[in-house]
Curated annotation (Swiss-Prot):
It comes from Bacteroides thetaiotaomicron (strain ATCC 29148 / DSM 2079 / JCM 5827 / CCUG 10774 / NCTC 10582 / VPI-5482 / E50). The gene is cysS. Its cofactor is Zn(2+). Binds 1 zinc ion per subunit. This is Cysteine--tRNA ligase. SMART domains: DALR_2. A motif ('HIGH' region) lies at residues 33-43. The keyword NADP does not apply. Zn(2+) binds at C31, C226, H251, E255. Coiled coil: none annotated. Monomer. A motif ('KMSKS' region) lies at residues 283-287.
Amino acid sequence: MEHQLTIYNTLDRKKELFVPLHAPHVGMYVCGPTVYGDAHLGHARPAITFDVLFRYLTHLGYKVRYVRNITDVGHLEHDADEGEDKIAKKARLEELEPMEVVQYYLNRYHKAMEALNVLSPSIEPHASGHIIEQIQLVQKILDAGYAYESEGSVYFDVAKYNKDYHYGKLSGRNLDDVLNTTRDLDGQSEKRNPADFALWKKAQPEHIMRWPSPWSDGFPGWHAECTAMGRKYLGEHFDIHGGGMDLIFPHHECEIAQSVASQGDDMVHYWMHNNMITINGTKMGKSLGNFITLDEFFNGTHKLLAQAYTPMTIRFFILQAHYRSTVDFSNEALQASEKGLQRLIEAIEGLDKITPAATTSEGINVKELRAKCYEAMNDDLNTPIVIAQLFEGARIINNINAGNATISAEDLKDLKETFHLFCFDIMGLKEEKGSSDGREAAYGKVVDMLLEQRMKAKANKDWATSDEIRNTLTALGFEVKDTKDGFEWRLNK
């Protein structure tokens, strides 16, 4: 490929040149949501981060198989091996079938992703649809001697595995650290070691979601699904596994252990993780109860929101920070993103107003601008630098439209292509349909306000002001009609 992409590999803690295992094919697996509630801003970040990666790899000419799973079973409360299944709990509280809960929130998740202009993955497998594959994975680990059965459940033997391999190589932990921070929960007596994690859990009598297995009627542990489904759709070795930084431990650490225990080596070449979105320095999350749903952002209905924010404002807000940086929510930051996005969209609209000249003014170098955008993307998806370059492009467009600079037809064509490529195709931004409607609504409010001022002027027999307002609006193309109830107006198009 022409462009050399480097990405930060969490496993090796450094940026590495991206070299696919089977070019031009790329296999990418990203951990999707556990669907027991509405998607929030924290869900938007990995979706947008890996959407940009998907878009860019595709642009570079790779044939990407992008797998993003749906967790609809096995994810217990507090990410532990005890407690109630998150989806089953929601179903019990709402007196629904678990799959009703899954389908309802999955539909809403898809709707939110569509609003954010997140492309659909190539495959979106459900954990509940791959129970057989997870049972087969558990059996392989048992056969290899790295798991044991206990009272109908099957646990991964972390201590035994750690003698042969390194448990903790992704997160940088050692087993003693893990043991010191492992909580003493109910049911730990089934385990040989508190750090052991469930591969299969025997279902209690009241547990709704259960499947038969060689060990018990039960359900798979949370970590099993991604290893099993990644292997099924991407093979025993694939290029990229992504997710939020909060998944490094225990989820992705356990995935590596399962992979190595069942096949002798790690399935994944590059581990990529986006950082968190925080509120007042604390991670935003459903389990913490401090989240704002995407619908609440779009509608402005949450008490912490000063206003509603469009999906593209949210997307732009996320892309203005590097994906490995923490982003702290604030209305001020979102409002700044809103203004910045509007500047870019207006600049793109301004491209169509430019009349090309014979030559391009000195100091305008479109090819360099395009090269710098590529350079930023190739440097571990540095979208903030891409945006900075596009703002420089916006400055150039505004200067040309103001008559302070000129641009040749060839350079204008390149500039248009650069903006459309990086703004729309790669970063996935778009001009929202509602934006022009919103502007028209705002204009309408201004006209109403002026005509109300005119009514006051007429009531005060200030005919000069009344006529001035009417004549000004008429000159701007508005037709004003006085009625017994006040006034009517329309814009003559």
